[in-house]
Amino acid sequence: MSVSAFNRRWAAVILEALTRHGVRHICIAPGSRSTPLTLAAAENSAFIHHTHFDERGLGHLALGLAKVSKQPVAVIVTSGTAVANLYPALIEAGLTGEKLILLTADRPPELIDCGANQAIRQPGMFASHPTHSISLPRPTQDIPARWLVSTIDHALGTLHAGGVHINCPFAEPLYGEMDDTGLSWQQRLGDWWQDDKPWLREAPRLESEKQRDWFFWRQKRGVVVAGRMSAEEGKKVTLWAQTLGWPLIGDVLSQTGQPLPCADLWLGNAKAISELQQAQIVVQLGSSLTGKRLLQWQAICEPEEYWIVDDIEGRLDPAHHRGRRLIANIADWLEQHPAEKRQPWCVEIPRLAEQAMQAVIARRDAFGEAQLAHRISDYLPEQGQLFVGNSLVVRLIDALSQLPAGYPVYSNRGASGIDGLLSTAAGVQRASGKPTLAIVGDLSALYDLNALALLRQVSAPLVLIVVNNNGGQIFSLLPTPKNERERFYLMPQNVHFEHAAAMFELKYHRPQNWQELETALADAWRTPTTTVIEMVVNDTDGAQTLQQLLAQVSHL
């Protein structure tokens, strides 16, 4: 009997089971203990294979692939700390709903807690963050193949969001020629191998029912808050709110076109807050809200009812409103709850939104990061998509820009970390094949710098704008101690990215004005390669411009 041959047959059943649940993209890091999984994935023609040498980046690459494909994405890593590097991507997926399947190779039980090399306690190491965790036994023909495949099917068939951790111990030898070992064990699955359905099919999840009193609430004064959703959902939400005559406060990730732009500016105006207090119901569609003023208003608003509609399970309401938590696909929910044509009830807010946008436009000429955030809609590629980083850049775009309705926008706004942003952007581009504009700060770029290796492999133009304000300037917006701010919060690195781009053979530009930036962009969109554009700006201008605009709009 060949241990290595049966390891591969065991792994082949696991990988084939994944294909029955829509897995097409599989991300693989190098490793020896994961050899059975890697070879099984390589031999399965249903998969599109992605590789990367850094497991943390690999997890985020999978996250980006899952964001766009809306399908589960598998990740294969070897044992030891390689597994721990998947933690950030797993956490993000749990908060934003992407489906990740983490196949982690492991030492067999007799090599754990005895000083064996590269052997750590992997079962349960992700605590409560996976939706499901499976600790498989070491491969053995004493366990029927139908147990293995039905165990996988149960976890994936009930997976609606987040990650599944499947820990896979393998004993040595890991290498060797294939023979007939375990062939009859594998063949007991019969015609399943020729089928394309799961061995075990789970019943579909029950979603929230239609709200029978909707006909009553739609006649009231309402407010629509739009969080993270798909491009198609964004367009439908805009039309729905417009028909109801309710003001729509659209997040940067809502893709609604933000019909009342600069919400995070005008929500700092007392007149706007006073008018919003008249709302009898707030319907929030989608989660992961960005704007600070929006979150502050959400925390203090007291409508008669506060409804949150999202496909992700969980509370999703840090303000703990009295109301309803409705688990449903947003587009389906809108269809179940049609709008009734009514006249808009808000008067002050549309006026304030227009005046706020005019105040932003009046400052658009200076070459700075706040101005870039406002202008970003002018620089979007046709038939493309936008990936927005975290920290200051996403807040500036949310507050100062107005993105087109239905234009795809992606970001990691679950845990809102700056780790893995370039890797996630790479996954977003690969899954869609669309021209992609990605924008991050300098510390975010440094954090995930080796992901530039992933950006060498693109199927359409990708532009990475690195806004270099020399540190974490979001802390300039916070009451951090002045004497300790630079050393302990901002942490300026005084670096530029020309040599990093050159190391990975990527195009590089460092424009000094808007004309040079626009010329670089025009050139970049012509070829299916990655271009790094480093925009060096004054350290604190972006934060100061935002604060000045907030003060100005608050007094309108």
Curated annotation (Swiss-Prot):
- Asked if the record carries the keyword Transmembrane, the reply is no
Known role: Catalyzes the thiamine diphosphate-dependent decarboxylation of 2-oxoglutarate and the subsequent addition of the resulting succinic semialdehyde-thiamine pyrophosphate anion to isochorismate to yield 2-succinyl-5-enolpyruvyl-6-hydroxy-3-cyclohexene-1-carboxylate (SEPHCHC).
List required co-factors. Mg(2+); Mn(2+); thiamine diphosphate
Q: In the Enzyme Commission scheme, what number(s) does this protein have?
A: 2.2.1.9
Q: Which family does it belong to?
A: Belongs to the TPP enzyme family. MenD subfamily.
Catalysed transformations (reactions): isochorismate + 2-oxoglutarate + H(+) = 5-enolpyruvoyl-6-hydroxy-2-succinyl-cyclohex-3-ene-1-carboxylate + CO2
Bound cofactor: record note: Binds 1 thiamine pyrophosphate per subunit.
| Gene Ontology annotations of biological process type | menaquinone biosynthetic process
- Quaternary structure and partners: Homodimer.
* Natural source organism: Escherichia coli O17:K52:H18 (strain UMN026 / ExPEC)
Protein name in the entry = 2-succinyl-5-enolpyruvyl-6-hydroxy-3-cyclohexene-1-carboxylate synthase
Q: Name one GO molecular function term.
A: magnesium ion binding
Q: In which pathway does it act?
A: Quinol/quinone metabolism; 1,4-dihydroxy-2-naphthoate biosynthesis; 1,4-dihydroxy-2-naphthoate from chorismate: step 2/7; Quinol/quinone metabolism; menaquinone biosynthesis
